[in-house]
């Protein structure tokens, strides 16, 4: 027997049963985004490597350690580690955002070479939302309201907490950076080698260190909110007022900075304690300078991303009320001489007239007992039975596989009407 080949570490398969839950979550996402009037876009998973170096920042962990990068002839390419940079690139390239507001969303796989763990994989799936051309805090609030509505639809709202911060303008961060470095230099003995490197290249990233001793010390560090410019301060205050007015509770987390360099002003995360250490479910904020940084006209922008793997895990963990649809509504069973064609004709008639129902025709032969076992295995709600007698009498036997109702015989012409009523009920 030939040696089997396994999936690559950190790259996962999704079974038919698991896919039902994924489809349920994805449909909730699409429904909420459509409710708010957002438009779907699709971008390639491979982009030019310099796009991410310029957008995310060369000293970030994502660019310096985690990207899947390769050469194609003389061009360096990367499997996208996140979606914002590619969306901005597409918006600039195709003129989607010139003198125009856009509210966009996308869904698809991303890739990062990091240590796989629960809810974090090397290939993962993100939903991203990007808004271009709106500067005021109302749109920041709308994105937070949109995510809150989604959490309610998914049945997880009571298990997530909103954390907010403002990281201000570039000048604000530069002033704060100096104060933070001066503070941390008094505690060099607590810094790991990696954190000492960050102190030089990107000291704000030390604020979300996993080092608990250092976290305690950082409670006494200067607060970024105290270094905000007036415009950023007013923007953040108005955002908080809006959230208060609509009853969205939040915590101001002065250590929240996000892991990518393009953010400014508002940053936010929805976090949960239900998934252990990997607590962030969704994160985002403003990135008003990124479009210009990537060669476009200056365009204010804001967005967020959520990891679907982590979202599905959270739904599984806390929402026990989900009733997922079965993979099959109707299973067509047939046995005997000249039953195959009528069975296939009936199945096609149902698919044409009741396209919302999932109809499966048995293939592969076998007696009625074997076919009914298969119908049970796929979770079908009804079996439609055609034998030699039914062919002669132009009838079909309908058997309720879940509800326990007595089976009945119907004329072929009445089957669609019966199923429409029975499955709707």
Swiss-Prot record:
Reactions catalysed according to its record: tRNA(His) + L-histidine + ATP = L-histidyl-tRNA(His) + AMP + diphosphate + H(+)
Any Gene Ontology CC annotation: cytoplasm
EC number, UniProt record: 6.1.1.21
Subcellular location per the Swiss-Prot or TrEMBL entry: Cytoplasm
Main location: cytoplasm
Gene Ontology MF terms: ATP binding; histidine-tRNA ligase activity
Broadest EC class assigned to this enzyme: ligase
Subunit structure: Homodimer.
Database matches in PANTHER family: HISTIDINE--TRNA LIGASE, MITOCHONDRIAL-RELATED (PTHR43707:SF1), HISTIDYL-TRNA SYNTHETASE (PTHR43707)
Assigned protein family: Belongs to the class-II aminoacyl-tRNA synthetase family.
Protein name: Histidine--tRNA ligase
């Amino acid at each position: 027997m030939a040696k089997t080949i396994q999936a690559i570490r950190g790259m996962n398969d999704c079974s038919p049963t698991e896919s039902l839950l994924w489809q349920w979550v994805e449909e909730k996402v699409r429904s909420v985004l459509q409710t708010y009037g957002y438009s779907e876009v699709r971008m390639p998973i491979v982009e030019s490597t310099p796009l991410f170096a310029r957008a995310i920042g060369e000293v970030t962990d994502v660019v310096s350690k985690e990207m899947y990068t390769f050469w194609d002839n003389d061009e360096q390419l990367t499997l996208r580690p996140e979606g914002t940079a590619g969306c901005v690139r597409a918006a600039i390239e195709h003129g989607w955002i010139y003198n125009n507001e856009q509210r966009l969303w996308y869904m698809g796989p991303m890739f990062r070479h990091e240590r796989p763990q629960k809810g974090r994989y090397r290939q993962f799936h993100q939903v991203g939302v990007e808004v271009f051309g709106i500067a005021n805090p109302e749109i920041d609030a709308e994105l937070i309201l949109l995510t809150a509505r989604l959490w309610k639809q998914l049945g997880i709202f009571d298990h997530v907490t909103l954390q907010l911060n403002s990281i201000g303008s570039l000048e604000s961060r530069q002033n704060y950076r100096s104060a933070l470095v001066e503070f941390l230099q008094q505690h060099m003995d607590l810094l790991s080698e990696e954190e000492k490197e960050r102190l030089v290249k990107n000291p704000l990233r030390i604020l979300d260190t996993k080092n608990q001793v250092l976290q305690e010390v950082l409670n006494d560090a200067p607060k970024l909110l105290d270094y905000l410019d007036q415009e950023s301060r007013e923007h953040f205050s108005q955002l908080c007022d809006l959230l208060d007015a609509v009853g969205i509770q939040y915590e101001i987390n002065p250590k929240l900075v996000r892991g990518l360099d393009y953010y400014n002003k508002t940053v936010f995360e929805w976090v949960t304690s239900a998934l252990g250490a990997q607590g962030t479910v969704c994160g985002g904020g403003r990135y008003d300078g990124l479009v210009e940084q990537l060669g476009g006209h200056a365009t204010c922008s804001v967005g967020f991303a959520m990891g679907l793997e982590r979202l599905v895990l959270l739904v599984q963990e806390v929402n026990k009320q989900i009733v997922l649809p079965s993979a099959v509504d109707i299973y067509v069973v047939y046995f005997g001489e000249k039953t195959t064609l009528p069975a296939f004709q009936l199945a096609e008639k149902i698919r044409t007239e009741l396209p919302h129902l999932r109809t499966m025709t048995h293939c592969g032969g076998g007696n009625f007992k074997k076919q009914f076992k298969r119908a049970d295995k796929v979770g079908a709600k009804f079996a439609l039975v055609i034998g030699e007698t039914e062919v002669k009498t132009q009838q079909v036997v309908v058997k309720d596989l879940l509800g326990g109702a007595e089976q009945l015989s119907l004329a072929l012409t009445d089957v669609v009407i019966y199923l429409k009523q029975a499955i709707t009920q």
